[in-house]
Amino acid sequence: MAAKDVKFGNDARVKMLRGVNVLADAVKVTLGPKGRNVVLDKSFGAPVITKDGVSVAREIELEDKFENMGAQMVKEVASKANDSAGDGTTTATVLAQSIVNEGLKAVAAGMNPMDLKRGIDKAVVAAVEELKKLSVPCSDPKAIAQVGTISANSDETVGKLIAQAMDKVGKEGVITVEEGSGLQDELDVVEGMQFDRGYLSPYFVNKPESGTVELEHPFILLADKKISNIREMLPILESVAKSGKPLLIIAEDVEGEALATLVVNNMRGIVKVTAVKAPGFGDRRKAMLQDIAILTSGTVISEEIGLELEKATLEDMGQAKRVLITKDATTIIDGVGNKSSIDSRVAQINQQRDEATSDYDREKLQERVAKLAGGVAVIKVGAATEVEMKEKKARVEDALHATRAAVEEGVVAGGGVALIRVANAIRNLCGDNEDQNVGIKVARRAMEAPLRQIMANAGEEPSVIANNVRSGEGNTGYNAATEKYGNMIELGILDPTKVTRSALQYAASIAGLMITTECMVTELPKEDKPDLGGGNPGGAGGMGGMM
């Protein structure tokens, strides 16, 4: 076991705080309408220019192990906010930095860290309740477009595109973002389906920057059985390898030797393959496999109807224009299925729904109709260069997540105003002792940090604007883009309630744990043993220092 370096008390906290501040300072320059870009160097290809907080956070690794621990914990805040709401990563980072800085000052002044954390937690619970009271529903296309615009860094065309996409496929519909071929953004609605099953192994991923699998014009094998023996798959794998197309396997499960062999073949480039579990359970799984078969013009390989996997041919495979697979969802875009077959299948499911006796069955049948008939909206992002394309695509994806969050839980006034109103609403909140009261003050002060950072990035004086907004009422705030005060909701400066709530909860959770840290342990760096000269044994003399 390697030797460890251990730091205690203030020594540990100072190092950790330095790491927190390095990461947060890099991320927070992107906040607000006048936030700046960050350029990320890549080991291959052009650098990436981004204004997305979580993309910046993920790139940062610090040389000092103790500082790096602090940075990694704040990175976790950004990642959690991103996973939960798809946006608000920079806000979460700014909140976490403020809570950690103020909290550690209080610890240095002699406050009890555990009581401080309890005070912070109390304040956050009360703040979330107040946020819910401030929230207004977001249902009309104009509000949806405004949320998309704000999240895409005030790009109105993106907001309008997302609103149009939601209008065409419904608020629960499937919307994907891909790189276009021209300079203009485009919206395309195609036949498609999404189900909640992701890839069975991360080794299938072929887009590591987004952690997804993208297959162009794949064959789709549908099997109503568990696949554990690779031998029964060999004939079809050989046929697919000869065709040069990728293969998507949708089966009850793929496990053991079969999964391992598929992974190895994929990694070696022998055949581009991905496996996912079939959606649903029991009879519903059989029905959904049949839905996918009709959508992709394939055949479900099932022993119940006398079809065996060993005898499957390319004619039994379904096909689609494109398949996108994340760790928890699969989207089939533009299956080659016959329109009349899809329509008759939809009519058949509708009839079953009308005859269903339970609400649960009706709901599940309605879901199947939506998947088959709803289609998929594809937003094609246009840009002049590859670098701009990647940056813009990331912004559009952020905006899409924010818009979905807004539809789900409503919106609050943007520009950091909602958090200032919430901090004011809980000003009379008291803890069980004085240290908890300090914790509540730390959380309330942190709630002003996003507005202050937006103002700092816009070149304004944060304290003056924060005081003016605090003395205002309702949704009155400061528009950093136009440098005017006004009603944020009426001005279309909206934040999804879910995004603001998630940012606050995750920031407080991890910052609270950091404040209560008393000891940090890390491995000591290995010292390079000095070269003994005279070359290596075995005739490799003179090559000792070369890699």
Curated annotation (Swiss-Prot):
Cystine pairings recorded for this chain: none
Chief localization: cytoplasm
GO CC terms in record: cytoplasm
Enzyme Commission (EC) number: 5.6.1.7
Coiled-coil regions listed in the entry: none
GO biological process: one example: protein refolding
Annotated Gly residues bias: 532-547
GO MF assignments: ATP binding; ATP-dependent protein folding chaperone; isomerase activity; unfolded protein binding
Region feature Disordered, mapped onto this chain: 525-547
Subcellular location: Cytoplasm
Reactions that this protein is recorded to catalyse: ATP + H2O + a folded polypeptide = ADP + phosphate + an unfolded polypeptide
Enzyme category, top tier: isomerase
Residue positions binding ATP: 30-33, 51, 87-91, 415, 479-481, 495
Pfam families documented for this protein: Cpn60_TCP1 (PF00118)
Assembly and oligomerization: Forms a cylinder of 14 subunits composed of two heptameric rings stacked back-to-back. Interacts with the co-chaperonin GroES.
PANTHER family in alphabetical order: 60 KDA HEAT SHOCK PROTEIN, MITOCHONDRIAL (PTHR45633)
Function: Together with its co-chaperonin GroES, plays an essential role in assisting protein folding. The GroEL-GroES system forms a nano-cage that allows encapsulation of the non-native substrate proteins and provides a physical environment optimized to promote and accelerate protein folding.
Protein name: Chaperonin GroEL
Organism, as annotated: Blochmanniella floridana
The organism's taxonomic lineage, starting at the top: Bacteria, Pseudomonadati, Pseudomonadota, Gammaproteobacteria, Enterobacterales
